[in-house]
Amino acid sequence: MTFISNLINGISLGSVYAIIALGYTMVYGIAKMLNFAHGDVIMVGAYISFCITTYLKLPPVVAIVAAMVVCTLLGILIEGMAYKPLRKAGSLAVLITAIGVSYFLQNVALLIWGSAPKTFSSVAPFNSIALFNGQLIITAESIITVIACIIIMIALTLFTKKSKMGKAMRAVSEDKDAAELMGINVNVTISLTFAIGSALAAIAGVLLCSAYPVLVPTTGSMPGIKAFTAAVFGGIGSIPGAMLGGILLGIIEIFSKSYISTSLSDAIVFAVLIIVLLVRPTGILGKKITEKV
């Protein structure tokens, strides 16, 4: 039962990484930039949810919606103030700005909520499930996380392929200048992309802290890095790739902790990424990019 339990835990953790990675892959796929402050938006969403449930005593559903609203507005604000002026700047300028935004959010959280860890309450509306006379426990958080991941991936896929705004996003992703000539508002499209990615980060933050109920200002840092790794692993810019990469990364991490070493699990995860990129630089489901000369 240990193997099955580890597999379930890996899929659950990987589903969180997948939801975060979807935010990365959407922003990169459409705006062609990497938002390394994405992990800290996760932290903000978790803190908002914590305040709603702990201080206002409102239901978890209200807390999740509030976290999504705040993070959506935060994502639009970050894009407008930090990234929009750098649209034509080099990638190094964007990277430095993203790191600066990340540290800014962490320090603001430190000023508001302090450095003491906060205990996060579970958002699950039902109890864990015990199977085989209690030998296998499937937590309610795991079930909710996996279901949420599947729903989000399907919804995003349908949105990008069927909706008018989704088609506009794909057009901007292919060629910004051509999309603008066709009447698409590129600025609004990119802002909407950041908004969606930040809303997903809020959901991921709540799910992550519900499963691992300790909340500090740096909560989103490592999950953010691992989710970026998952996005690259699966093929950054690909929605199914983000989900596949996240789940595989979660499984590798949990099995590494269980069968090899807890202290080496992160190193193993990143080593696997390096091997995959050496064999397939675009990731598992990434498309090969060709340039015409």
Question: Language-model segments: what does each one mean?
Answer:
Residues 8, 30-77, 81, 86, ...:
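Membrane-embedded helix boundary and interhelical linker motif in transport proteins
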Residues 57-69, 194-201, 207, 211-271:
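Transmembrane alpha-helical segments in multi-pass inner-membrane proteins
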Residues 15, 24-46, 60, 88-93, ...:
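Short, non-helical or kinked segments that cap or interrupt transmembrane helices
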Residues 46-51, 67-74, 101-109, 148-157, ...:
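Hydrophobic core segments of alpha-helical transmembrane domains in multi-pass membrane transport
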